[in-house]
Amino acid sequence: MDILPNDRISKEKKMLNYVSVSGYGWTGSSACIDLLREFEGFGAIQGEFRIAKDPYGLRDLEESLVNNWDFVRQDIAIRDFLNFCKVLSRETSLFSRAGKDFSNKLNVDFMLESKLYIDKLIDMVYLGNTSVHRYYIPAYKNFFMKMKSKFGNGNAVPMYLARPSKSNFARETKNYINNLFSGYANLKKINTLILDQAI
């Protein structure tokens, strides 16, 4: 049996327990959450946490990296996931872009944790170019990119290559979710987190 040194034990993050409560419309999931909060060690974040099931979330990422792999698809899925995480991370106000403010709600650098998670999944980053990257750029930018190509200057951008196994994806995703919530759990002194509409 291996025994970890005391300093190693204190630095490791304890795995949390999760309870996912789902409903449809106003079917009462919040009442269920309020009831579960009454138990010792249970807590819930404010609002829904839908990173697993929303478009560009974890389910789409797994589908593209593990179940339906394609050379370009996996790069686009990672980009979409990181852009989605920007929305989840940033604050929102009346005159700003939409955001969910999870960096503040969870007491974590949401984007840093998301980038570290992706770093664990990818095999390499390389310079590449695909027309798919130009699908959503403005016409003027597309024009300049075409001109750049005409004069022999490439439009290569960093691209991701990731093909994790199902077990590796599951392990890293579990660690990622735990890293997102561990600061909040420590702050609130809870060991079981209730998530609304998570799956």
Question: Model-found features: residue ranges?
Answer:
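PAPS-dependent sulfotransferase catalytic core
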Residues: 1-179
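Conserved helicase/translocase P-loop NTPase motor core
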Residues: 171-199
